[in-house]
């Protein structure tokens, strides 16, 4: 890259080349010499030559063609930079070498064939490019600021949602704690009530037994005294004494009544199930929180030609007119089916489907293995790599081998699918009532995908969420 010539900066006022005084109303000739306008000779004084040329600069005697404009060229703002080599002011710029030039530099052999212009003229293209770049950068900056503003708004929305969810979680657990505390108080109150009943019946039992012991003690003492009486006295009251000696059967009272024992046993059974209920609740809560309810979409590469997918790939409907689609080893051609995306090879996952059944039509919802048959006739069973339920207006059955008829009270409109890969479990349930429809036990190997099929005109299913 050409180096910039050495410049020296002085702090003197520019001088006229003719009068050597400060420049007033400065102009420059094409050669680069600078004069006061009043110091420059008139054109008639320069004189026209017979060769058709005129003298433009009285110092360097430079001649130009007569048709060349002879008016002195006005200077732009004069700087205070001088050529260090020649001591002349810098007026020119060489675009080829990117160097500042004085008059002598410009006339030198180095720059004869180069593009040389006045500083003000030479700088204009650069200024234009800088302005253009400045405009582009300003636009880019504005766009980035707009994007940043939008992203900040999205971020703020997310942060607000997170804050709301935090409050919801705190409120939910606070309500749960209140309900658990209420149930704890009820259980303890019931236990205290049973405890009081036990003590009450114990006191009653002790009272009855004590009374009987006292009665028997008094009778024993009386009989002992009779035994010490003389025969004449004892025989005198023989009939009375015999009646007193007759044994009376004492019915021993029960310490705790059978009714109270039954209440205690019933309550004991309830208490025994409490730890298991708490454990199941904890496991179900953890299970629910671990479930991935991510976005499921329909994979168009697997869709049968008899199916029409929505633009957002969330809905599919049946059509009698098969679509002209490129063949693919992934595409179903024997069954109007489509797989969901993504597939899963681990974890717990859940999704929900809205069903619309056409006249005589139906839908299939479930899970299929990655190696499920795509071409020709395919079976719907676990042996074929499909774990699903088939739903029509009249009935619902599971894709077992043979199929399992599911006598439901009503045909579900919304069906949920819960996949537990590690447990090898696929559960389908009524998403409105949360009632289970059917649970498959499986041993997965490789990826499994959400599986859907619809048949007959008017049948349609839509992924929710």
Swiss-Prot record:
Per the UniProt record, one Pfam family is: SPRY
Q: Where are the zinc fingers (B box-type)?
A: 78-119
Coiled-coil regions listed in the entry? 126-229
Task: Give all residue intervals belonging to the B30.2/SPRY domain.
Answer: 276-465
GO: which molecular function terms? Answer: molecular sequestering activity; transcription coactivator activity; ubiquitin protein ligase activity; zinc ion binding
- Catalyzed reactions: S-ubiquitinyl-[E2 ubiquitin-conjugating enzyme]-L-cysteine + [acceptor protein]-L-lysine = [E2 ubiquitin-conjugating enzyme]-L-cysteine + N(6)-ubiquitinyl-[acceptor protein]-L-lysine
Primary location class: cytoplasm
Q: Which GO terms describe its cellular component?
A: cytoplasm; focal adhesion; nucleus
Any one of the GO BP annotations:
innate immune response
Annotated zinc fingers (RING-type), start-end: 16-61
Task: Report the enzyme's class at the first EC level.
Answer: transferase
Q: What is its EC number?
A: 2.3.2.27
Keyword tags? Cell junction, Coiled coil, Cytoplasm, Metal-binding, Nucleus, Transferase, Ubl conjugation pathway, Zinc, Zinc-finger
Q: Which InterPro entries match?
A: B30.2/SPRY, B30.2/SPRY_sf, Butyrophylin_SPRY, ConA-like_dom_sf, PRY, SPRY_dom, TRIM/RBCC, Znf_B-box
Q: Where in the cell is it found?
A: Cytoplasm; Nucleus; Cell junction, Focal adhesion
User: Which residues does Zn(2+) bind?
Assistant: 83, 86, 105, 111
> Known PANTHER family for this protein?
E3 UBIQUITIN-PROTEIN LIGASE TRIM
Q: How does it assemble?
A: Interacts with paxillin/PXN; this interaction recruits TRIM15 to focal adhesions. Interacts with TRIM8; this interaction prevents TRIM8 cytoplasmic translocation.
The protein's job, in short, is: E3 ubiquitin ligase that plays a role in several processes including innate antiviral immnity, cell migration and chemotaxis. Acts as a 'Lys-63'-specific ubiquitin ligase for MAPK1/ERK2 and MAPK3/ERK1, promoting their activation by facilitating their interaction with MAP2K1 and MAP2K2. Also plays a role in cell migration and chemotaxis by acting as a stable focal adhesion component upon recruitment by multi-adapter protein paxillin/PXN. Functions in the RIGI-mediated interferon induction pathway upstream or at the level of MAVS.
> Family, per the entry?
Belongs to the TRIM/RBCC family.
Protein name per the record: E3 ubiquitin-protein ligase TRIM15
State which gene encodes it.
TRIM15
């Amino acid at each position: 890259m050409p180096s910039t010539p050495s410049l020296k900066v002085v702090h003197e006022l520019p001088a006229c080349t003719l009068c050597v005084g400060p420049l007033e109303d400065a102009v420059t000739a094409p050669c680069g010499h600078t004069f006061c306008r009043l110091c420059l000779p008139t054109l008639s004084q320069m004189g026209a030559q017979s060769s058709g040329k005129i003298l433009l600069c009285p110092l360097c005697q430079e001649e130009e063609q007569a048709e060349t404009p002879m008016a002195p060229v006005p200077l732009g703002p004069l700087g205070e930079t001088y050529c260090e080599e020649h001591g002349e002011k810098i007026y020119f710029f060489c675009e080829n070498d990117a160097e500042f030039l004085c008059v002598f530099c410009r006339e030198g052999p180095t720059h004869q064939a180069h593009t040389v212009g006045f500083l003000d003229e030479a700088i204009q293209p650069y200024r234009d490019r800088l302005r253009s770049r400045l405009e582009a950068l300003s636009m880019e900056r504005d766009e980035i600021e707009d994007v940043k503003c939008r992203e900040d708004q999205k971020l703020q929305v997310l942060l607000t949602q997170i804050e709301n969810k935090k409050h919801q979680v705190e409120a939910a657990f606070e309500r749960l704690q209140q309900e658990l505390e209420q149930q704890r108080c009820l259980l303890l109150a019931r236990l205290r009530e049973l405890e009081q009943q036990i003590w009450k019946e114990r006191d009653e039992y002790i009272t009855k037994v004590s009374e009987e012991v006292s009665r028997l003690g008094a009778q024993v003492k009386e009989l002992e005294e009779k035994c010490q009486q003389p025969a004449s006295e004892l025989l005198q009251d023989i009939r009375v004494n015999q009646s007193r000696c007759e044994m009376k059967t004492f019915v021993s009272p029960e310490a705790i009544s059978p009714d109270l024992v039954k209440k205690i046993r019933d309550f004991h059974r309830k208490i025994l199930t409490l730890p298991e209920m708490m454990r199941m609740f904890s496991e179900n809560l953890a299970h629910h929180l671990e479930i991935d309810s991510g976005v499921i979409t329909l994979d168009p590469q697997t869709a049968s030609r008899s199916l029409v997918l929505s633009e957002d790939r969330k809905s599919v409907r049946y059509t009698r007119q098969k679509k002209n689609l490129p063949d693919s080893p992934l595409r179903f051609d024997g069954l109007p089916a489509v797989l969901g995306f993504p597939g899963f090879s681990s974890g717990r996952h859940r999704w929900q489907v809205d069903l619309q059944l056409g006249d005589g039509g139906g839908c299939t919802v479930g899970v299929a293995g990655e190696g499920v048959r795509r071409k020709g006739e395919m079976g719907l069973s676990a042996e074929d790599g499909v774990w699903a339920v088939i739903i029509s207006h009249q009935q619902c059955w599971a894709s077992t081998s043979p199929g399992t008829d599911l006598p439901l009270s009503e045909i579900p409109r919304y069906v949920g699918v819960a996949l537990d890969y590690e447990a090898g479990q696929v559960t389908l349930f009524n998403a409105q009532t949360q009632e289970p429809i059917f649970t498959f036990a499986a041993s997965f190997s490789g990826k499994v995908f959400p599986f859907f099929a619809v048949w007959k005109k008017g049948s349609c299913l839509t992924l929710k969420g």
